[in-house]
Amino acid sequence: ETLNLRVKGDNGLEAVKGLDMIIHEGEVLGIAGVEGNGQTEMIEALAGLRKVEKGSFRIGETNLTNSTPKERREKGLSHIPEDRHKRAAIDEFTVEENMILGVEDDYAKGAILDFAKISAKTNEYIKKYDIRTADSKVKFGGLSGGNQQKVVVARELEKENRFIIASQPTRGVDIGAIEMIHNTILQEKTKKKAILVVSAELSEVMSLSDKIAVMYEGKIVGVLKREEATTEKLGILMAGGKIDE
């Protein structure tokens, strides 16, 4: 839940202007909108990567407004970022090494990493998520875009979480990977997770979401139930227009 969330962009101007948003357990809220209307800044603020100027963000009863990304992960936040190379993975690391980024504590015995467990879990996820790689020791940068994204999705969805942020989850991936990622997100919904999907692809937002909110100039200008939403209605809201209720 966010309440009156206000966030500045890199230019110092307000990019998110008083955002109120509630996502329930077992619900997917999709955010539609032309890119550059505050979506990136909103996601970065929720993930702890950008300062919240005003307002609040909480998961359940836990206020996470001023917490670190690590604290948010520990409280049940998973984040599939829009730029996997900048925010989610390191090309020079192996698939195994990327699979434990941010969740190293889950694979440690005291101060020592349990490499056998890391290898076993990574190979389990490679099979489960159909990650096409010779083995878990291959460098992440050597994988195709779709398989890179599957590594990030596997890591973020397999850890303990309550709230999942999926930002442009299928950008730059092939059709087969898109279907697999969509199915995985919908499976998480059945586990009573609260899920936020942000995508520039209207078809993606419409196929995954229970409700669709449209962002325009840093504000949510309309929320439609999936059965009410049409590309025409969403397009009008995305352009700053109004629709008849």
Walk through the language-model features, giving the residues of each.
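Glycine-rich phosphate-binding loops of nucleotide-dependent enzymes
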Residues: 1-245
